[in-house]
UniProtKB/Swiss-Prot annotation:
The UniProt record lists the keyword Transcription regulation: yes
Taxonomic lineage of the native organism: Bacteria, Bacillati, Actinomycetota, Actinomycetes, Kitasatosporales
Taxonomic source organism: Streptomyces griseus subsp. griseus (strain JCM 4626 / CBS 651.72 / NBRC 13350 / KCC S-0626 / ISP 5235)
Protein name: ECF RNA polymerase sigma factor ShbA
Domain notes: The sigma-70 factor domain-2 mediates sequence-specific interaction with the -10 element in promoter DNA, and plays an important role in melting the double-stranded DNA and the formation of the transcription bubble. The sigma-70 factor domain-2 mediates interaction with the RNA polymerase subunits RpoB and RpoC. The sigma-70 factor domain-4 contains a helix-turn-helix (H-T-H) motif that mediates interaction with the -35 element in promoter DNA. The domain also mediates interaction with the RNA polymerase subunit RpoA. Interactions between sigma-70 factor domain-4 and anti-sigma factors prevents interaction of sigma factors with the RNA polymerase catalytic core.
SUPFAM superfamilies referenced in this protein's UniProt entry, alphabetically: Sigma2 domain of RNA polymerase sigma factors (SSF88946), Sigma3 and sigma4 domains of RNA polymerase sigma factors (SSF88659)
Amino acid sequence: MRDDETTVIGALVHRAVEGDAQATHDLLAHVHPLALRYCRSRLNRLPGDARHFVEDLAQEVCVAVLMALPRYKDTGRPFEAFVFAIAGHKVADLQRAAMRHPGSTAVPSDEMPERPDDSLGPEERALLSSDAAWAKKLLANLPENQRELLVLRVAVGLTAEETGQMLGMSPGAVRVAQHRALSRLRALAEQ
């Protein structure tokens, strides 16, 4: 996220909190891609078919942001941190549901597809799945704060400055923590 985008979002938030409908619409147009990227990066770690819920979950995040706007108070942190916190809670809710009731996140359908399935075949999925399982296992050995930092930096694509604002750290501390997390992952991978 660029500084000018953060400035635009900040101005939209101020107007949306005051009840400006167009600003609210424009704000949600900025929030949705952020929520989508965050949810996609977090749900890739889920077992089963929960990944099909990425778009729905991003919409839920947008609705939750919309509902929370009238009560939103600027605390000096970027509005994006507020969005990521809501998204984190929504992802955690879905993860808990998926773990409690395996298979409950499947998406059954009685309809025939309109076009052929161009997705990966069984062998390719197995290879990707084993790599994903291996990465998931490695990430599980990291503390939650290091996992979250890596998700924001690597999967969501935030800069060190933006990640620092989200997590309440300086950009230098983010870089050091990222280096330590990646070093730890490298050591775990070599075991």
